[in-house]
Amino acid sequence: MKKIDITGIGIGPFNLGLAALLSHHPEIKSVFLERKPEFRWHEGLLLQGTTLQVPFFADLVTMANPCHHLGYINYLHQHDRLHQFYYYDSFLIPRREYDHYCRWASKQLPDCRFGENVSHVEYDAKLDKFIIESESASGEKQKYISQNLAIGIGTKPRIPKWLETCKHPLVKHSAEFAKIQEQLKQCKQVTVIGSGQSAAECVLALFNSLTPEQVKAGASIRWITRSAGFHPMEYSKLGQECFTPAYMQYFQSLPRDKRRDIAASQGLIYKGISFSTIGDIYDVLYERSVAGEKSGLSLYTSC
């Protein structure tokens, strides 16, 4: 049984960033466990032309430690891409490169253990510690006693109840879009449900591939949301202040009920669609509707 100061369950960007920062603090014993064999970030949405919605400064470590060796700038340097990035002239990096950057970092962190599935977690009141049991792909079992837990398992894809029992191979969550994108392009009608960034990117990819000839033959895309509209993400300079350490300290000082009310009203800080994606969709809509022609895309709100 191994005694640990902090155990991370799941290795996504948040726990990977924590592992990277802790690598400069050897006095803190840590381990991070992930059942997947290697780091992969939203592989079903690593679409050509997509970027992060936040500047590259929000990498794994820079905002906490700008001198850290696992920062994005050093990643570029190590891959001989620093000058190309300078000429790229954008704060928003390609999503595929962010995934590659995270995989590069994960391979330099021995405390990140991939292919190790956490099978049981319990709190021992007598020890005032957590007991974590895990098993590797080869069947090797481990047990850890940990003072702290960092849960980073991500969110479960949400499927509407009325679709949960549907077994059609092309009824999928957007997290699997890249796997079925080519098949969807051959469908006469496609419906996309949801009005977040992922849904918008699926719509844009399908819309760009829809030819005028297909539209004339009856092909179409329907974009449906229960929201009142297809809203942009809050990305104003004042809005971004919600992510500063000063605001977080203020937020944590508020009563629990107040924090819940505020959090419930801040959905568009992270749930909306980027201005650029909205603009790209509208531009295609405009061009496709010249001379009253059908664009091939219909939008439905409040459904």
Predicted regions and their residues:
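Tryptophan-centered motif/residue detector
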Residues: 41, 45, 72-75, 104
